[in-house]
Amino acid sequence: MADSAPRLAALDDSIVSRLPSYSQSLFAAKTAHELSFSAIAEHLGRSEVAVAALFYGQATASPEDITKLAELLSLPEAQLRKDLGTGFPDRGRSGPMPPVEPLIYRLYEVVQNYGYAFKSVINEKFGDGIMSAICFDTKVEKETVEGADWVVITLRGKWLPFTRF
């Protein structure tokens, strides 16, 4: 009979050297408590992608996030506050470019294959500008269509028109 325990995302050893040292502690506690990013997100009142980004050092934790993480993961709050509450995220350096991890590469491939198509359609709808990745949110959902599972990724960014100067 198959094991019914949930499968949880763990830290990939091949990227540990590119991540903040606290990432290992967060992932170890997540595994020890058998928590999914979804469960942690519910406790923090944030999206699961935002929580995963915290674990990888790609997002900023609020003081409330730190308190709730310390409580949920049984980690010393003072240490978490020191690790997560000071400095700024070092975004964009957690993996090689182009990506070598297959799922991450597929996302990269989507941009390679459809980037200019997305840009053209967006420009026609909004004009000359960019979609913010700062004033931004995202979510991942699972959808089943005719018995097949589909990944639905929503990217929602504020429109920033280029200004004339």
From Swiss-Prot:
Which is one Pfam family of this protein?
Cyanate_lyase
- Top EC class of this enzyme: lyase
Any one Gene Ontology BP term: cyanate metabolic process
Q: What SUPFAM superfamilies does the annotation carry?
A: Cyanase C-terminal domain, lambda repressor-like DNA-binding domains
Cite the active-site annotation.
Answer: 106, 109, 132
Per the UniProt entry, the Enzyme Commission number(s) are 4.2.1.104
Instruction: Quote the InterPro entries the UniProt record gives.
Output: Cyanase, Cyanate_lyase_C, Cyanate_lyase_C_sf, Lambda_DNA-bd_dom_sf
**Transmembrane parts of this sequence:** none
Keyword annotations from UniProtKB, A to Z: Lyase
**GO MF term (any one):** cyanate hydratase activity
User: Which reaction(s) are listed as its catalytic activity?
Assistant: cyanate + hydrogencarbonate + 3 H(+) = NH4(+) + 2 CO2
The record's function comment reads: Catalyzes the reaction of cyanate with bicarbonate to produce ammonia and carbon dioxide.
**PANTHER family the UniProt entry points to:** CYANATE HYDRATASE (PTHR34186:SF2)
Q: Which family does it belong to?
A: Belongs to the cyanase family.
Name of this protein:
Cyanate hydratase
Give the source species.
Answer: Podospora anserina (strain S / ATCC MYA-4624 / DSM 980 / FGSC 10383)
